[in-house]
Amino acid sequence: MPLAFCGTENHSAAYRVDQGVLNNGCFVDALNVVPHVFLLFITFPILFIGWGSQSSKVHIHHSTWLHFPGHNLRWILTFILLFVLVCEIAEGILSDGVTESRHLHLYMPAGMAFMAAITSVVYYHNIETSNFPKLLIALLIYWTLAFITKTIKFVKFYDHAIGFSQLRFCLTGLLVILYGMLLLVEVNVIRVRRYVFFKTPREVKPPEDLQDLGVRFLQPFVNLLSKGTYWWMNAFIKTAHKKPIDLRAIGKLPIAMRALTNYQRLCLAFDAQARKDTQSQQGARAIWRALCHAFGRRLVLSSTFRILADLLGFAGPLCIFGIVDHLGKENHVFQPKTQFLGVYFVSSQEFLGNAYVLAVLLFLALLLQRTFLQASYYVAIETGINLRGAIQTKIYNKIMHLSTSNLSMGEMTAGQICNLVAIDTNQLMWFFFLCPNLWAMPVQIIVGVILLYYILGVSALIGAAVIILLAPVQYFVATKLSQAQRSTLEYSNERLKQTNEMLRGIKLLKLYAWENIFCSRVEKTRRKEMTSLRAFAVYTSISIFMNTAIPIAAVLITFVGHVSFFKESDFSPSVAFASLSLFHILVTPLFLLSSVVRSTVKALVSVQKLSEFLSSAEIREEQCAPREPAPQGQAGKYQAVPLKVVNRKRPAREEVRDLLGPLQRLTPSTDGDADNFCVQIIGGFFTWTPDGIPTLSNITIRIPRGQLTMIVGQVGCGKSSLLLATLGEMQKVSGAVFWNSSLPDSEGEDPSNPERETAADSDARSRGPVAYASQKPWLLNATVEENITFESPFNKQRYKMVIEACSLQPDIDILPHGDQTQIGERGINLSGGQRQRISVARALYQHTNVVFLDDPFSALDVHLSDHLMQAGILELLRDDKRTVVLVTHKLQYLPHADWIIAMKDGTIQREGTLKDFQRSECQLFEHWKTLMNRQDQELEKETVMERKAPEPSQGLPRAMSSRDGLLLDEDEEEEEAAESEEDDNLSSVLHQRAKIPWRACTKYLSSAGILLLSLLVFSQLLKHMVLVAIDYWLAKWTDSALVLSPAARNCSLSQECALDQSVYAMVFTVLCSLGIALCLVTSVTVEWTGLKVAKRLHRSLLNRIILAPMRFFETTPLGSILNRFSSDCNTIDQHIPSTLECLSRSTLLCVSALAVISYVTPVFLVALLPLAVVCYFIQKYFRVASRDLQQLDDTTQLPLLSHFAETVEGLTTIRAFRYEARFQQKLLEYTDSNNIASLFLTAANRWLEVRMEYIGACVVLIAAATSISNSLHRELSAGLVGLGLTYALMVSNYLNWMVRNLADMEIQLGAVKRIHTLLKTEAESYEGLLAPSLIPKNWPDQGKIQIQNLSVRYDSSLKPVLKHVNALISPGQKIGICGRTGSGKSSFSLAFFRMVDMFEGRIIIDGIDIAKLPLHTLRSRLSIILQDPVLFSGTIRFNLDPEKKCSDSTLWEALEIAQLKLVVKALPGGLDAIITEGGENFSQGQRQLFCLARAFVRKTSIFIMDEATASIDMATENILQKVVMTAFADRTVVTIAHRVHTILSADLVMVLKRGAILEFDKPEKLLSQKDSVFASFVRADK
């Protein structure tokens, strides 16, 4: 057929110009083409020449991006313009098809306008990103011309009586409005930027973030199209496929998204609430108001997007209704009644009655709906992430001010705080993500019910009633599910606590043969957890079942009721399949209801917990002595605003205040020079708990400035508490603590600024920083150097001096990377002595004028202690006139003290110089004298020089390298370093980018067993086959309903027609019932499979780990093992089953849908191939990026949580150093790193979902177009068309879920892979060569030990730590073993228990070679006390006798021997008194005494003490030594000496050096030899 612009009819009115050219419709249309052609000719050269060249691309970088005024409005108007132009094109084609003649002018101008609109926005984008607004003048001209020409057309339409009944008139009016608005936007740009018509144009710089090329998260800065489609992520996803993603690849957060910005916003909201409500500033209601005030605006935006998306979602059912209804009726040819300007214009009704138009509108509605939905998700998640970062920062700042009593003995534990950070902040984040559903769900339900009623009539209310009535059941199931999850979490936490204790004390458990006891303890808790998990699985399966069964049941009841009770009503395919789609939409919000309710409840609980935490007590700042105000410019760097304690009711403390009222207003003593003291306490009463009895009573001390002060006393007398009270960490009941404010804070630090004072605290200025080394060393998860310098500038000379003073150089030399080696997990890669020395080195390195050292010698031998005292404390500190306060048990150092404070039972016994004690406390002084009895200075210097002689250090524990004798040969250093690097998993994090093998999936499924796996696969396939059969039968049924309608059925008997309907209804009922039953079977099978696998894997893992050799625990970080039991087991328990169910369901649904569409229209397969290729590459690129981003999200969260845990653990140290601001800055960096990873992961998920849903929309369009074509040619029934379209919509819904679940499953299977890796760990050989019947029951009854040519190593790849050792120990002998650090003392003791590889020689005990004994028998018949005390949470009785073999009298006897009987009797419950985790409610010395008592309980004939008295004062140690010698007179005792004087009374003394026996004789004989090494040790220890 010939084509012509104005039509092929010569007599057409389109050619007439007798009434003027503007009255000619074709001319007006041609006139409308002119502006578009103008724009194309002007802009194309600029785009292709200016921005198309490679040189120009170099200059267009995101650093020049900015948004012109009206940016978003322009893009929105352009999108609307494009939509209206598409409608105009379609309207023109339809209008042109009515007549025989073809009129190109009906749609060609609209096509040109469409191209021009796209060109205009591309042109605008390039100009905007290059910040060159003068070229916008072309757009100004274009919008002006387009507005004028379109207005002329609109006026001419009006003149020719073309009105609202014609769609062309409405579209033209809309175009006039749109062009006018775009013209106004362009004029506004001129007004604001003044780039033309003004003399002084305004220069606008791009955002500050874009000037920083490190900012790579560009979502806030890109144009609206890129925001909606995440187009800017394309380059990132492509790069991620080529190389791994790391923190450098994702860059930094924009300023507006950083934790500090959001924290400040939250603080402003809190301040605003505080001004409104002064009563409950931190209450839960105030927190909710503050959160809404700070982040509510973005939440409203997300909710708006969500409501728009939900409303657009109803376009699918309506378009299906229209298309199928159109195809189900006879084709009607519209006879033109009236022609205007020579052509016929279709009406709106005719336009929407066209099936192809509806298909295109459905496609566009799906695109827009998916875009709005993903925008809602993104905005909500971004808001939640920002909120999480703000709350985490607020929690951290609160921690910095938290009262120590809340952490040590109060209501707040470190675990609770970490849960608050890790769990509760995430609960709030996810609540904000689900929050838009709260008001979107009612809208969706109401609209859905109205549309169902419109389509089905009254019968629709039946199905809606079924869904709504079942909503309470869903809520009940969700509530039970939440309860089961909470119960599971409680048992899981208890199991992890027990597992953590078991792993931390694994050495003790193996030495005592208690593995099975603690393993059974964990398994008992696991059984309780599995019971709760079964309930969780049951309710999960019910929830899954209801999600899939409710739509089937609602459709069944509705359709059967519809044809049964309303026989004359319409049951055509259009009604049935539109209703089916509406039911699926209606069910969705009811499914979400349970999740939203659970999330809301969890958020309410989390906010309540947050409120309680923020309201907890804070520390006080101590007073400073009055001084002259400092100059204004000399404010101290660490000066902090004084803090106020939250008032509480403390009856016990108030009573003390009443008694000590006169002490409330005190000033420092003015005896002598006012500046001769550093700290002064007057009448101080201090307590840990708010309502407790004071731990320290009537404390009045004066610590001199620039001198060495020592605090001494017995175990538990309050020495460490006195230091903490001085630092302001204890609750002060009464009295006063004064810091000399004339002391400069540190080198380069000025005194505090008095202008920071408040009226309420005029005398409570802050003290300066104090270098503090706690008794329990606190190390950062950082390098050795970073732990020592501790954020201070690196000074090489000072650093070397500190390293030498702490004798750390030999230990550093043996580390894999020297002082750049990562140490973490509380320093578990290092020995106790090394941790202690690094902690002390930190205090020595700092430039503070005040240094507090809390028992720094407890874990050091005599040589290291003497060297640290001489080179560190005396030379580096005291000689530098720094104030040093030293808590110690080593009384031999008292002569060095300038001032001594003696404590007893929480009070000051006396303070003064050593001479003062000699004069006034003669008895105490004589007691000290007998303990210290030092030699002259010449001998001391000789000993120090001897200690400086070079020897290979063996200080590094077995976890790092060869340990003993490792560096004897220099040529093996490289081999050793390589091995250490391989063993040390903390030295470097290797990014595992390799794809997780699907063998892990096979291992997971095979763990379920072949029967359960077969049932799982068969039930899933059968269920989806039945679901397809249900919908196919519905199509057949509705097609028959068309034939059997009253107008067309032509039945002779109405009973025959009713019979046909009943047969269809009956078969439909059977299929639906079968489908519901299969839904139940599949949901139960999936959860049962998950339970069985979880139970089997955990049991295998626990049994394998508990039997692993000690070498495994020394070379594998504890956190890595614990993560297998925590996060990986949790993934297998709760996440993999649900992911597996979702993956199988979404995959089978997509396959079913594509199969049905291909069956309905086979030509669809042609279009399916390219779509499948695109889909494959999208998912391939996404899975790589998603896996990397997910791992990055997890790995960046670990340092954040670790930083919180480190801060809580080292809070006293941080506050003592005044490093709060530095640690807060690190927190912000960690939070931003985690948030940027989370945001990129969110953007990547949205990138995938937008593309997958766009592909789904394409599937719908192609399926609709092909179905319509086949139906119009009478090759396809309307029912099958409805079936195909319904399944096409299903593809668009489930395609992205399939890829997302595939990526999630790939990540989650990593947990299975990691656990199976641990299952390959080789176990210890517990079996013995001797049968149990051949071992005497009372073996060993004598205690005779023969050591024959014994050589020991820790691993077959390592060097020996003991070489050719021979010794004979007679029954009942007391053997003392000494030697320098690394000489092999501990290895010697471990050899008795076969904890090391005895590759040569043997040990014979009472005639039996221990290598032939079963390990459990051997270890249960010996006793050992380790250097590091290990206590478990539980009762004292459990800690002493977990096997429950001993009577109470035996336990009390052991406590009496250990000097603990009085302490335990004073506790509530006595033997049943509770010991907290790690024994934190007892001092370090008391914990060691409990370990001694535990060993005494066993009453074995061989007793080994491995530096067991390191944390005990000398007086108590001497008592214990006497008791041991008396109580164990008939037993063989092997003592590894911490203080050499403790083995002077031994029968024999063994001196080890480099793994060999250097000396082995009676102590008297060795002391008589002048050149004896043992004699030199004794002289050094005096």
Curated annotation (Swiss-Prot):
Biased composition (Basic and acidic residues): 753-766, 939-950
Ranges of residues in domain ABC transporter: 679-930, 1345-1579
Segments crossing the lipid bilayer: 31-47, 73-89, 107-123, 137-153, 170-186, 304-319, 357-372, 439-454, 461-473, 542-557, 577-592, 1014-1031, 1068-1084, 1144-1161, 1163-1175, 1250-1265, 1282-1297
Residues holding ADP: 1381-1382, 1384-1387
Localization per record: Cell membrane
A single Gene Ontology CC term: presynaptic membrane
Molecular function, one GO term: ADP binding
Cysteine pairings via disulfide bonds: 6-26
Domain ABC transmembrane type-1, residue spans: 299-602, 1013-1307
Binding positions for ATP per the UniProt entry: 688, 716, 720-721, 1483
UniProt entry keywords in alphabetical sequence: ATP-binding, Cell membrane, Disulfide bond, Glycoprotein, Magnesium, Membrane, Metal-binding, Nucleotide-binding, Receptor, Repeat, Transmembrane, Transmembrane helix, Transport
Extracellular side: 1-30, 90-106, 154-169, 320-356, 455-460, 558-576, 1032-1067, 1162, 1266-1281
Cytoplasmic topological intervals: 48-72, 124-136, 187-303, 373-438, 474-541, 593-1013, 1085-1143, 1176-1249, 1298-1582
GO BP term, example: glutamate secretion, neurotransmission
Residues annotated as glycosylated: 10, 1050
Organism superkingdom: Eukaryota
Positions of the UniProt region annotated as Disordered: 741-768, 939-962
Membrane topology type: Multi-pass membrane protein
Function text: Regulator subunit of pancreatic ATP-sensitive potassium channel (KATP), playing a major role in the regulation of insulin release. In pancreatic cells, it forms KATP channels with KCNJ11; KCNJ11 forms the channel pore while ABCC8 is required for activation and regulation.
Subunit structure: Forms an heterooctamer with KCNJ11; four ABCC8/SUR1 molecules interact with one KCNJ11 homotetramer.
Name of the protein this chain belongs to: ATP-binding cassette sub-family C member 8
Protein's organism: Rattus norvegicus (Rat)
